[in-house]
Amino acid sequence: MPKAYENAGVSVEAGYEVVKRIKSHVARTNRPGVVGGIGGFGGLFDLASLGYKEPVLISGTDGVGTKLMVAKLANKHNTIGIDCVAMCVNDIAAQGAEPLFFLDYIACGKNDPALLEQVVAGVADGCVQAGSALVGGETAEMPGMYDEDEYDLAGFSIGVAEKSAIVDGSTIVEGDVLIGLPSTGVHSNGFSLVRKALFEQAGYTVDTKLDELGGEKLGDVLLTPTKIYVKALSPLFKAGVVKGVAHITGGGFIENIPRMIPDGLAAEIELGTWPVLPIFDVLEKAGNIDHKEMYNIFNMGIGMVLAIDPARKDEALKLLADNNEPAYVLGQITADTTGTQIVLK
């Protein structure tokens, strides 16, 4: 055993134990195209085996922010990895990508094999949901950089789309319909405000049970995993009915929906056309947050917004219903008369 490194605060043996524990979780994410297993210096993937004619690789990276601090407070670490995968694969799915493989990065103050196994198990769960292989990762034990009970988590997703099928919003025109896919909760954005409003201002804890939330523990509601939309979107992409997709993450409706819309056009959203989840009402009241500002921070119950030709609206809704995916017609594309590219009515 390397005593000098151990004395510096880095446990090589604990690192070996983590690798041993996560192998079975990695194995269940295997998919066509994966070459070999973990342990090499890089993850291998045979893109040619998938039969794409003009493949374009689409990449994304993200983390889960200070939602990790809620996981720490609740001592619940087995779902935070799903969030990490979701934040990455939803971003690339918004451009029409089929997720292929994923890598994770965990930095910690002290290598705790049991805890890190929970985290990676969650990453593997997310990869299975997304149809993405977990082909590698890094666990960095950094004493002095992090406290012993702290860790950070980030992920990297690579996907592929046919060049002709990339979804970039360029064909969106006035009159196109906006369809929203519901979120499962706060997802993984805005948690600095979440913690301030609920824990500091309102004085709640992760164990607080609120009638507005059905009597569930607040920590459990906040740690509900971010929804992965890959399988919901796939039939729509194959049918060619989607013109643009906005993943509603940091910045809420106000910042994310305009990202898919060409200049000169705007999204007109009819408030009240979908059910806003109770957690957002709790947050608004606890933090004394202006109602309109909520739409500039949180997803407000909608995790994805799709732009669809009105002639194909019913087809898109049927494809979603056939896949047991709820959907709401939120509004339409109009001329941009405000310069903001979005109007909430």
From Swiss-Prot:
Could you mention a single GO BP entry for this protein?
adenine biosynthetic process
CDD domains attached to this UniProt entry: PurM
- Single GO molecular-function term? phosphoribosylformylglycinamidine cyclo-ligase activity
User: Where does it live in the cell?
Assistant: Cytoplasm
Indicate whether Iron appears among the record's keywords.
Answer: no
Identify the pathway. Purine metabolism; IMP biosynthesis via de novo pathway; 5-amino-1-(5-phospho-D-ribosyl)imidazole from N(2)-formyl-N(1)-(5-phospho-D-ribosyl)glycinamide: step 2/2
Give the UniProt entry's GO cellular component terms. cytosol
**Enzyme category, top tier:** ligase
Kindly state which reaction or reactions the protein catalyses.
2-formamido-N(1)-(5-O-phospho-beta-D-ribosyl)acetamidine + ATP = 5-amino-1-(5-phospho-beta-D-ribosyl)imidazole + ADP + phosphate + H(+)
Which Pfam family, giving just one, matches this sequence? AIRS_C
**Alphabetic keyword roster:** ATP-binding, Cytoplasm, Ligase, Nucleotide-binding, Purine biosynthesis
**What's its EC?**
6.3.3.1
- Family statement: Belongs to the AIR synthase family.
NCBIfam families named among the record's database cross-references: purM
This chain's protein is named Phosphoribosylformylglycinamidine cyclo-ligase
**Lineage of producing organism:** Bacteria, Bacillati, Actinomycetota, Actinomycetes, Bifidobacteriales
